[in-house]
Amino acid sequence: MEYLIVALSSYLLGSIPFGFILTKIFLKKDIRDIGSGNIGATNALRTGNKTLGYATLLLDITKAVLPVLYVKFNYPDYIFIASLSAFLGHVFPIWLKFKGGKGVATYVGILFSINIFLGLVFIISWAVTFLISKYSSLSSLVGSLMVPMYLIVFENYNSIFFIIMFVLIFYTHRENVKRLKNKEETKTKIY
């Protein structure tokens, strides 16, 4: 029964659509009508309000950190259930008819909560790719892939949950992948 409570509460917290909420409150607009139509931090940056974009990023990370850290210290056997549930909540939020963000910021929160080093693997991979390409989408895909690859090669660690999350991140970026392939993807300005 505990795992169901962990899964449901983590999903519900993960499903809070902060990009949607902040854009509605501060810009009186629906973020789904701006840029890519996505509710995540990168699209929140496209609103032209950097503070709103960074606030969305921080809150999307935090909504994963809270349940995962709580479970890590109170129900450690369920940490991957909490992680995947928070992630699925962000990507498929009940509040927005299961049309959510791409999951990257939530993934980062999960990584840092489970193991700071895993978070650093993602951040370093993301940063190097971004410095070279200026594509947030490509950087997110590379960073998301590097975590399970690192675990498989160096740690002999159960990486199935990280592989599942990478596959979902790849799925949520499928239009970006098409644009990258066709050299039509928009570069991102983060500062």
Curated annotation (Swiss-Prot):
It catalyses: an acyl phosphate + sn-glycerol 3-phosphate = a 1-acyl-sn-glycero-3-phosphate + phosphate. Its main location: membrane. It is an enzyme of class 2 (transferase). The keyword Transmembrane helix applies. The keyword Cell inner membrane applies. Probably interacts with PlsX. InterPro entries: G3P_acylTferase_PlsY (IPR003811). GO terms for molecular function: acyl-phosphate glycerol-3-phosphate acyltransferase activity. Keywords: Cell inner membrane, Cell membrane, Lipid biosynthesis, Lipid metabolism, Membrane, Phospholipid biosynthesis, Phospholipid metabolism, Transferase, Transmembrane, Transmembrane helix. Belongs to the PlsY family. It is a multi-pass membrane protein. Catalyzes the transfer of an acyl group from acyl-phosphate (acyl-PO(4)) to glycerol-3-phosphate (G3P) to form lysophosphatidic acid (LPA). This enzyme utilizes acyl-phosphate as fatty acyl donor, but not acyl-CoA or acyl-ACP. It comes from Pelagibacter ubique (strain HTCC1062). It is found in: Cell inner membrane. GO terms for cellular component: plasma membrane. Pfam families: G3P_acyltransf. The chain crosses the membrane at residues 3-23, 51-71, 78-98, 108-128, 150-170. This is Glycerol-3-phosphate acyltransferase. It comes from the Bacteria. Its EC number is 2.3.1.275. GO terms for biological process: phospholipid biosynthetic process. Pathway: Lipid metabolism; phospholipid metabolism.
